[in-house]
């Protein structure tokens, strides 16, 4: 990691406003920030979008969308789950799994190219290109479920997300999400550039 830290330090000396380098350098230095720069997340997934599904599903046998869907359906044995907002919906892998169990499905994501892939799956009633917190601040949050599948590892401090959903959703909607675990208190920025969270 020493060579990488040196490279990003040099990059910041040349371009002090290089936010992506700041984030990676913080991760490599063991410094935990509240959230990554939006441009870092957007560029990361814009670049990943064309091969995202093949990389996760085919190569890594990614199963979290299916597991989350099965858990929700099992704990809510009703004919329809009602309306669902897929936070950080990406290419729509969770949407594919849960579409048949809900009456309305909407998705929001920071990466426009990921949303293009999600649109090709034809499972969402509406897709919105927006930062997650901005969306929660401004849009109607009248949903029965909020799902965030491997999204919060790119958020960090979740307090604002939790607060907005609780205060702006008046229909008692439930939030279901996955995280990567840490034994440290609160949340921690790993060297991978992703965040881990404690209970």
PLM regions: where:
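A short glycine-rich, Lys/Arg-flanked "PGG" loop and its adjoining helix->strand segment in the class I
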Residues: 159-171
């Amino acid at each position: 990691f020493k060579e990488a830290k040196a490279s990003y330090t040099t990059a910041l000396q040349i371009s002090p406003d290089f936010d992506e380098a700041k984030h990676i350098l913080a991760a490599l230095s063991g410094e935990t920030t509240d959230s990554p720069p939006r441009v870092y997340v957007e560029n990361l997934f814009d670049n990943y979008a064309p091969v995202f599904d093949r990389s996760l599903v085919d190569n890594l046998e990614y199963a979290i969308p299916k597991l989350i869907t099965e858990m929700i359906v099992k704990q809510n044995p009703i004919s329809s789950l009602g309306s669902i907002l897929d936070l950080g919906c990406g290419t729509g892998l969770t949407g594919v799994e849960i579409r048949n169990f809900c009456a309305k499905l909407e998705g929001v994501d920071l990466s426009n190219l990921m949303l293009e892939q999600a649109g090709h799956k034809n499972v969402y009633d509406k897709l919105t290109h927006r930062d997650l917190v901005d969306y929660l601040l401004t849009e109607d949050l009248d949903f029965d479920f909020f799902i965030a599948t491997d999204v919060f590892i790119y958020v960090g401090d979740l307090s604002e997300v939790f607060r907005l959903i609780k205060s702006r959703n008046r229909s008692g909607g439930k939030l279901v999400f996955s995280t990567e675990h840490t034994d440290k208190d609160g949340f921690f920025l790993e060297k991978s550039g992703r965040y881990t969270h404690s209970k």
